A protein has these predicted regions:
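Pre-recognition alpha-helix immediately N-terminal to the DNA-recognition helix
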Residues: 19-27, 73, 97, 101
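N-terminal intrinsically disordered/low-complexity leader segments
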Residues: 1-15
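Hydrophobic alpha-helical connector segments
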Residues: 65, 80-108, 149-152, 162
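Helix-turn-helix
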Residues: 15, 19, 23, 27-61, ...
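Alpha-helical DNA-contacting segments of helix-turn-helix folds
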Residues: 40, 64-70, 120, 129, ...
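Hydrophobic/aromatic-rich alpha-helical bundle segments in the mid-to-C-terminal region
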Residues: 114-116, 127, 146-193
């Protein structure tokens, strides 16, 4: 563990490091971050523990690379959707797509999402990554809507508030399952609330 961490340059070494990160992604998703150790990650990746420590200082170091994968895979569709918006913006249709996408992301990445979000409260680097992602998406939407001629007072604040609503609803829809809630009706309320934030 005391050996120097190296950045792989050869194709075989890069592939080996990627296998370790993928193994970490799978194990953190399946059994959680705290229930996984580097020996298990090494075994899943088909390498020795020494190889793991050649590329990563510790398990947390692997987690930060796992977070990069999660962010790219989970949020790329949202950013693509934003980039493809055209004027005049159909907020009802767009927000419907955003809600569907958010629900699907939370379903697909349920375990890793839970693991990473629980760590965001105790790990500064993880928390900073999520804040950076929030900033990137908020500003990307604000810039795109401004380019498309959307003129709303406090646009950035509206977008950030909308993102909080989408996140909260997705958690409720995918994870919480209150028996007294009609989630289809709740989805309509959320969509109408969000449309009212942006539509004239």
């Amino acid at each position: 563990m005391g050996q120097e961490v190296r950045e792989p340059k050869q194709e075989r070494s890069i592939e080996k490091k990627n296998r370790i990160v993928q193994a970490g992604f799978e194990l953190f998703s399946q059994v959680g971050y705290y229930n996984t150790n580097t020996a298990e990650i090494a075994k899943r990746a088909g390498v020795s523990t020494g190889i793991v420590y050649g590329y990563f200082k510790d398990k947390r170091d692997i987690l930060l690379d796992v977070l990069e994968i999660y962010v790219k895979e989970a949020f790329a569709p949202v950013l693509d959707m934003i980039n493809n918006l055209t004027a005049p913006v159909n907020f009802e249709g767009t927000i419907g797509h955003v809600l569907d996408s958010a629900i699907n992301i939370h379903k697909k990445y349920a375990n890793i999402h839970e693991a990473l979000h629980s760590l965001s409260h105790s790990d500064e680097a993880v928390n900073n990554k999520f804040i950076s992602l929030e900033d990137e998406i908020t500003l990307a939407i604000a810039n795109k809507l401004a380019d498309l001629g959307v003129k709303k007072e406090n646009l950035t604040e509206r977008i950030h508030f909308a993102m909080d609503i989408v996140q909260s609803f997705s958690h409720e829809y995918v994870y919480d399952h209150h028996t007294y809630i009609d989630y289809d009706e709740m989805r309509k309320i959320v969509q109408n609330t969000l449309v009212a934030l942006f539509d004239d």
